[in-house]
Amino acid sequence: MKQEGSARRRGADKAKPPPGGEQEPPPPAPQDVEMKEEAAAGSGSTGEGDGKAAATEHSQRELDTVTLEDIKEHVRQLEKAVSGKEPRFVLRALRMLPSTSRRLNHYVLYKAVHGFFTSNNATRDFLLPFLEEPMDTEADLQFRPRTGKAASAPLLPEVEAYLQLLMVIFLMNSKRYKEAQKISDDLMQKISTQNRRALDLVAAKCYYYHARVYEFLDKLDVVRSFLHARLRTATLRHDADGQATLLNLLLRNYLHYSLYDQAEKLVSKSVFPEQANNNEWARYLYYTGRIKAIQLEYSEARRTMTNALRKAPQHTAVGFKQTVHKLLIVVELLLGEIPDRLQFRQPSLKRSLMPYFLLTQAVRTGNLAKFNQVLDQFGEKFQTDGTYTLIIRLRHNVIKTGVRMISLSYSRISLADIAQKLQLDSPEDAEFIVAKAIRDGVIEASINHEKGYVQSKEMIDIYSTREPQLAFHQRISFCLDIHNMSVKAMRFPPKSYNKDLESAEERREREQQDLEFAKEMAEDDDDSFP
């Protein structure tokens, strides 16, 4: 208790102000301590940020090293293709082009141009201004793929075209289309002067990206004459890959400006090479399907677009498959068929096909009001997809479907009620539409013009008609087409492979000779014994 009392007195003494009215200075504010702690924490976070930046830079340098080694390997494949006259090595290099193009940057291309263009100073000086010169660091990569005598040897045209193509792709991905156009024009000028079969595959890729550059610049009409000239040259040289690529580029060019007649003439006057790869075949079938759809050949359009989906890659090219599905759905609706609901439920297609799903529902039910609502809501999207013109034609199909639904529901109905249900202007319009539906075989009915009503006839047994037979024929033809296309897509050994193989008759003769020789040997062995 005494200790507690003394402690209280000491506390009271400390609480009293000092003599003279002066007070002790207040203790330092705790904010100063907090600011110091925050500063220390800030310096620590800055250190961590620097460490992360250094780690990121190190990983980027490693990725650049791998990319340069890949480019070096692709160049080696091109050189092997030229020396061995084997185009499959060029295909190996071009097959990795999408993966390589995603990893390109200023540093990689600067090192590649400096490393490969050792003897061709003019091309090197032309390409380097389009790239930013990297800063010299201690960890800078020394990339010298050509040393010794190879450094002074001229670069192969295939390798030079491949490296310039990488530059064009990089500038396109960077949205520097004007600069990409300059390099691509220079590349086309060099390719046009060459006549080398090993260059054909690389040139086909160059044509594709050359047209893409002009498409981004909205100058596709400028490049059309050049593509025609290269198509003539590729056809005369039997360059299948170049011919397929150029045909597709010209069709895309015509369809971009809605020149369907010129596109149809090009398709009819040219032959698409059978040796073309599946990707080019898929593009060609899609373009021809669009042409056939515009020209009212809906059955042929559906066939070609179904084949285009079959030729397309199964797990990639999602955008291409979405585009084909949009047009295919509209064509099937124009044919009077309703697309399968599972088609709209695929995860990769569900979102993009939603407007077309609503359109299909409107056509299936024959609801003209809902059809007009979908058209008003998604009209701009349909125009962007290039299907708006075909969808406008669906209005008559919607009306026909509505007439058929009314005919199935009512044995007799007045023309005024039909006009009201179909949202037509007058009963006379309904009379014309019903008369046309009867003439086209959409419904089985008769019109009483005096009393103004439609009398539906009794339904006949559909199995007594030819419709089931035609449906089975269509399915069987589809299966046979799949079988024939699968056989064509298979790889078979060359004909020279059979030269070294003996026929069945030759094999029998050889076996007979072996048996006779064995008998003679046995007789000789028997004679050798006394």
Swiss-Prot record:
Molecular-function GO term, any one: enzyme regulator activity
Superkingdom of origin organism: Eukaryota
InterPro entries, A to Z: 26S_Psome_reg_C (IPR013586), CSN3 (IPR050756), PCI_dom (IPR000717), TPR-like_helical_dom_sf (IPR011990), WH_DNA-bd_sf (IPR036390)
Disordered: region residues: 1-65, 496-530
Pro residues: compositionally biased ranges: 17-30
TM ranges: none
Entry keyword set: Isopeptide bond, Phosphoprotein, Proteasome, Tumor antigen, Ubl conjugation
GO biological process, one term: regulation of protein catabolic process
GO cellular component: cytosol; nucleoplasm; proteasome accessory complex; proteasome regulatory particle
Keyword ATP-binding carried by entry: no
Described purpose of this protein according to its UniProt entry: Component of the 26S proteasome, a multiprotein complex involved in the ATP-dependent degradation of ubiquitinated proteins. This complex plays a key role in the maintenance of protein homeostasis by removing misfolded or damaged proteins, which could impair cellular functions, and by removing proteins whose functions are no longer required. Therefore, the proteasome participates in numerous cellular processes, including cell cycle progression, apoptosis, or DNA damage repair.
The protein's assembly and partners: Component of the 19S proteasome regulatory particle complex. The 26S proteasome consists of a 20S core particle (CP) and two 19S regulatory subunits (RP). The regulatory particle is made of a lid composed of 9 subunits including PSMD3, a base containing 6 ATPases and few additional components. Interacts with UBQLN1 (via ubiquitin-like domain). Interacts with ERCC6.
Name of the featured protein: 26S proteasome non-ATPase regulatory subunit 3
Native source organism of the sequence: Mus musculus (Mouse)
